[in-house]
Amino acid sequence: MAFISFPPRHPSASARLPLTLIALDDWALATITGVDSEKYIQGQVTADVSQMTEQQHLLTAHCDAKGKMWSNLRLFREREGFVWIERRSVREAQLTELKKYAVFSKVVIAPDDDRVLLGVAGFQARAALANVFSDLPNSENQVVRDGASTLLWFEHPAERFLLVTDVATVNMLTEKLHGEAELNNSQQWLALDIEAGIPVIDAANSGQFIPQATNLQALGGISFKKGCYTGQEMVARAKFRGANKRALWLLAGKASRVPEAGEDLELQMGENWRRTGAILAATQLDDGQLLVQAVMNNDLETESVFRVRDDVNTLHIIPLPYSLEE
C-alpha cells in the first residue's frame, strides 16, 4: 500500500495560503474497469457519465434506493474505465454497495491503494507545477495525464490541483520545492473544500442525505435527463415536487472545540437556542477561526446566529462561491 504523510499544522484560509503540498490521506481512490464500466456506473450515480469527456472530472453521488447518498464521488475517466476519489472513511462501505449487482456485468470494482493523492494549493501553485509538468489542467481541460500522474484542476475557493500519482513523484516534488512549499495534512484540503462549498461525506453522514440537501445540483452533479439509476425516483421527486427542504451552508466564527461530523448545531431564537441541522465537516484555521459545513433548512435567514452545542461563541453564515438559484 502506497502512503504519504506530512506533519500536521493548522490549515490556512485560501486567501492567505502559501504554496503548500498536502497529503490527502483522509481521501481514497477506487476504480471500475471492464467493458461494461460505463453502463454499470451510469446505472449507479446521479451524473450522466456518458456525456463526460476524458478532460473532465465531476462530483456525483452514489445513492441507496431511497435516494440517500452512500457517498459523493469525484469521478473521471481512465482508459476504458473510471476512477473516483472519496473520503477514506466511506470507501469500504460504498464499494460494497456498488458491487452488489456487479456479478451480472463485465466489470471489476476495486480500491486503489497503489497510487497516492497529493494536493497542491496556495501562492503560485500553477507556477510551481509548471516547473515539473509539461502540461497543466485548467478550466477547459480539467484533467491532464503526464506519465504516472493524473492532475485535476479545481477553481474554488482559489485555483488548486489534485494529483493522482506515485510515491516517487511526490518525493520528487517535495524535494524540488523544498524551501518554497509548506507541507500539511488532509485538514488543509478539507478546509479548502469547506470554503468551496464542496460537500464532505464521511461515515457519520453516509446514508443520511439526498444529493440536493448537499447542493450537488448546483455543482453539476445531478442529471435530471439521464436514464435510470439507483435512487433516481426519490432524487427526481425532490426536484419536481419540491420535496427537498435542506441545503448545505458554510458557517464561520469561533468555538471552544471543533465539532465532529454528524453533530447538530444550535440556532439562536430570541433568548433561546434550538438544535438544528447536521455538521458534515469542520476545521479550525491557523487564525483561530472555525469553519463549519452543515446541512440545514434551505430557508434560513442569512443573518441567523448559530453555535456549537452549548458553546459561548457564535457562528455566522458565509456566502458560498456558487448560486443555488435554478
Swiss-Prot record:
Tell me where on the tree of life, at the top rank, the source sits: Bacteria
Molecular functions per Gene Ontology: folic acid binding
GO annotation, cellular component aspect: cytoplasm
Mention one GO biological process in which this protein takes part, according to its record.
RNA modification
Binding locations of folate: W27, W189
| Location in the cell | Cytoplasm
Summarize the protein's role: Folate-binding protein involved in regulating the level of ATP-DnaA and in the modification of some tRNAs. It is probably a key factor in regulatory networks that act via tRNA modification, such as initiation of chromosomal replication.
PANTHER family registered for this protein in UniProt: TRANSFERASE CAF17, MITOCHONDRIAL-RELATED
Protein name as it appears in the record: tRNA-modifying protein YgfZ
